[in-house]
């Protein structure tokens, strides 16, 4: 099989074989040989050779290729959505929205580059000051499995627009989506070597991250892996490292008038994409008293009716499987540890079949758990924390090393003003789900959630470096000389 895309050609990998599986059926979705260290070296060398020509290409010419990519995505929406659903378990209705977001991101990325990193001029008394932006060179892009099309392209598109060349290492759990996406780039007319694909598992990733000829590494994925990368590049200031990672995100519930609206937004926050969005709410803060009890009863009632099914089921389910049977088992195990520490299940999570990734959406009350672990459980496991005062809720919401997203559901505008001033997160929403974000706004967090704003408007900032010039069209001796100079 030809699994790798290097220097404009599909070639076979020379590393170990691996496969991806449909988490809802356990059927093999993709299989092939991974990229060895030698394959990775060839991919980086190809990107290095292509850099001079690609970066010298007119900005508009680069953008035309990227626009063709977006148009082809729209044409192939159903095929790519099917590939996403097959490998991730994500229902087709949601996979289709991912492909649409991939295409829409192109226009935003072009606008962002022009507005944030385009050329700017300022007249001076004896010339002009010019700010330009230059690409870094060869950048490695590491993609996650939860949005295997959308999130890698949130790095790749702005990197290419800026004039960089790319070596792309997708998640080993979604190699088929990566291949389908790169095929679209190839058809769009991307020159050989500008984008290279290396498939593989941990060893492939290590070979790419350790390569001495990359100029940047753009990563979306777990905080644990991102932290390792940050430590690895701690002594290499020449490497541009952009990290977008996870969160232990809080959603604070106020005593609102519309109970069902609050329940709906809570379910969307906690269980959309089977809880596999980095912005999903992990901790739900509920007021003590009668309202809190009514809210939890209604939340449990609606949640208990949520079904999970295969990605192409008819009718479509709200949730699909989580990414793998192993991931499902880890979620159930995390729940068990919390129960051992004193948590009380409201709806207990179970794994439908040990071979598959199906788990039910679960709600567990952790109010009485001392020293609650500050962990991101990447799935539909909602932890309930009851609070006595609004200030207590905010204090406990901020008690995390992460800082990606946070939300408040409340009718009181004064409560919102206080919340947005005191909460610590990069995405803070009011009366909207925590995982609602605009591609035209910064996307990212603070603390262990990352150090840049990839996959959105601000991605242009780390894809090129600023170059300042002071220029004059005519070389002349200045009228006033420095002391001690005689002509």
From Swiss-Prot:
Q: Which reaction does it catalyse?
A: N-succinyl-L-glutamate 5-semialdehyde + NAD(+) + H2O = N-succinyl-L-glutamate + NADH + 2 H(+)
Task: State the EC number(s).
Answer: 1.2.1.71
Enzyme kind, highest EC tier: oxidoreductase
Query: Where are the membrane-spanning stretches?
Result: none
GO BP: arginine catabolic process to glutamate; arginine catabolic process to succinate
Which keywords, in A-to-Z order, does the entry hold? Arginine metabolism, NAD, Oxidoreductase
* Listed InterPro entries: Ald_DH/histidinol_DH (IPR016161), Ald_DH_C (IPR016163), Ald_DH_CS_CYS (IPR016160), Ald_DH_CS_GLU (IPR029510), Ald_DH_N (IPR016162), Aldehyde_DH_dom (IPR015590), SuccinylGlu_semiald_DH_AstD (IPR017649)
Coiled-coil boundaries: none
Q: Where does NAD(+) bind?
A: 221-226
GO terms assigned for molecular function = succinylglutamate-semialdehyde dehydrogenase activity
Q: In which pathway does it act?
A: Amino-acid degradation; L-arginine degradation via AST pathway; L-glutamate and succinate from L-arginine: step 4/5
Q: Which residues form the active site?
A: 244, 278
Q: Which domain of life, per UniProt? A: Bacteria
Recorded family membership: Belongs to the aldehyde dehydrogenase family. AstD subfamily.
Q: Which PANTHER family is this protein grouped with?
A: ALDEHYDE DEHYDROGENASE-RELATED
The protein's role, per its UniProt record = Catalyzes the NAD-dependent reduction of succinylglutamate semialdehyde into succinylglutamate.
- What is this protein's name? N-succinylglutamate 5-semialdehyde dehydrogenase
Organism the protein comes from? Burkholderia ambifaria (strain ATCC BAA-244 / DSM 16087 / CCUG 44356 / LMG 19182 / AMMD)
**Encoded by which gene?**
astD
């Amino acid at each position: 099989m030809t699994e790798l895309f290097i220097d404009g050609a599909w070639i076979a990998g020379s590393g170990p074989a691996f496969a991806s599986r449909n988490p809802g059926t356990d059927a093999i979705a993709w299989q092939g040989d991974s990229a060895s260290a030698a394959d990775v070296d060839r991919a980086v060398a190809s990107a290095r050779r292509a850099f001079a020509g690609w970066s010298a290409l007119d900005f508009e010419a680069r953008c035309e290729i990227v626009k063709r990519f977006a148009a082809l995505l729209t044409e192939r929406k159903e095929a790519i959505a099917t590939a996403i659903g097959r490998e991730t378990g994500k229902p087709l209705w949601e996979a289709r929205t991912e492909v649409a977001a991939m295409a829409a991101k192109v226009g935003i990325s072009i606008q962002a580059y022009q507005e944030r990193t385009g050329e700017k001029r300022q007249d001076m008394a004896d010339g002009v000051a010019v700010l330009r932006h230059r690409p870094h060179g060869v950048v490695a892009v590491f993609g996650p499995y939860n949005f295997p099309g959308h999130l890698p392209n949130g790095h790749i598109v702005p990197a290419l627009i800026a004039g960089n060349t790319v070596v792309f290492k997708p998640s080993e759990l979604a190699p088929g989506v990566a291949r389908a996406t790169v095929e679209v780039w190839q058809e769009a007319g991307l020159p050989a070597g500008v984008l290279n694909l290396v498939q593989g598992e941990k060893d492939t990733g290590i070979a790419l991250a350790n390569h001495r000829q990359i100029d940047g590494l753009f990563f979306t994925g777990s905080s644990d892996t991102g932290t390792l990368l940050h430590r690895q590049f701690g002594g290499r200031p020449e490497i541009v490292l952009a990290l977008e990672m996870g969160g232990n995100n809080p959603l604070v519930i106020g005593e609102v008038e519309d109970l069902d609206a609050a329940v709906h937004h809570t379910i969307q926050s906690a269980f959309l994409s089977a809880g596999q969005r980095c912005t999903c709410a992990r901790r739900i803060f509920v007021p003590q008293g009668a309202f809190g009890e009514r809210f939890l009863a209604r939340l449990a009632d609606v949640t208990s009716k949520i079904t999970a099914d295969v990605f192409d089921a008819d009718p479509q389910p709200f949730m699909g499987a989580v990414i793998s049977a192993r991931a499902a088992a880890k979620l159930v195990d995390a729940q068990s540890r919390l129960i051992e520490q004193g948590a009380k299940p409201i709806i207990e999570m179970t794994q439908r079949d040990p071979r598959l990734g199906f788990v039910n959406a679960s709600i567990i009350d952790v109010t009485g758990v001392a020293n609650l672990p500050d962990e991101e459980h990447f799935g539909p496991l909602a932890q309930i924390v009851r609070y006595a005062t609004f200030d207590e809720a905010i204090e406990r919401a901020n008690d995390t090393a992460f800082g990606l997203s946070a939300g408040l559901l409340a009718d009181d505008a004064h409560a919102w003003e206080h919340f947005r001033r005191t909460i610590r997160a990069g995405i803070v929403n009011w009366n909207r789900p925590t995982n609602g974000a605009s591609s035209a706004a910064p996307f990212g967090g603070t603390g262990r959630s990352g150090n840049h704003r990839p996959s959105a408007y601000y991605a242009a900032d780390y894809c090129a470096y600023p170059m300042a010039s002071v220029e004059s069209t005519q070389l002349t001796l200045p009228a006033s000389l420095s002391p001690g100079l005689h002509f």
